[in-house]
Every structure is written in C-alpha cells, then in structure tokens.
Amino acid sequence: MATMTEEREAQRTARRMRLDKALGDVVRTLRSMGAIRVMVFGSYVEGPLRRWSDLDILAVMPSTRSGAQWFRDVHAAIDTDVPVDIVTFTEQELSARRATSSFVRRALRTGRVVYEQGQEG
C-alpha cells in the first residue's frame, strides 16, 4: 500500500511527464510559426511542481506582427492537455517591457531558454 508521500511523488512525476510532452509540442508549434526564442519559467523551472502546475512560456516572435497579434495566433494554434500560459513579444517590445515590467524581468531572470533560432541541434 502506497503512502501519502509516495502517492504525491507519483502524481508529481506524472505531471512532469505531461508538462514535458506539452512543452515539446508547444516549442514545435512556435518554431513552425517562426519563433526567435522560447523560454519556460515559473514552477516548471523553479519548482515545486504540483499536480495542477501549468506551463509558463515567453516567446519572442518576428516583428512581422505585434506581440498582441502573435498572442492571438499562437493561442489559436496551441492544443495541449495541460494549461499553458504563453506571453508573446517581438524583440523591440520585449526590450521596452524589460524596462517597465517586473513580470518580464523576473521571467527573463529565472526562465530557461528551451529554443533559440540558429541554435538548433
């Protein structure tokens, strides 16, 4: 009979596997849309993971559209079985937000780059 601690650990392991799969799917979708850089931040990187943990992603997209336009397009294209919060910026928007947004500064400081254009393979 599993203890409560063992059950929680099994739940966290199962959640990590679902989040890992979803992250791979999201990165593939963002790459196909032309992403310049993709970062994951929040509990996925910093812990602790809980059974309700989601993915927090910051995507730097080409300047062919605004971050707001990319946001709509990206969210329409993403389909995962776990909650995913994605914020999208162009390089210029990200530079401007870095100066004014503690949320953006924290995501950049604590996040982990999982894709960068030109750094594949």
List the model feature ranges, each with a label.
Residues 1-37, 45-51, 62-121:
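Catalytic core of pol beta-like nucleotidyltransferases
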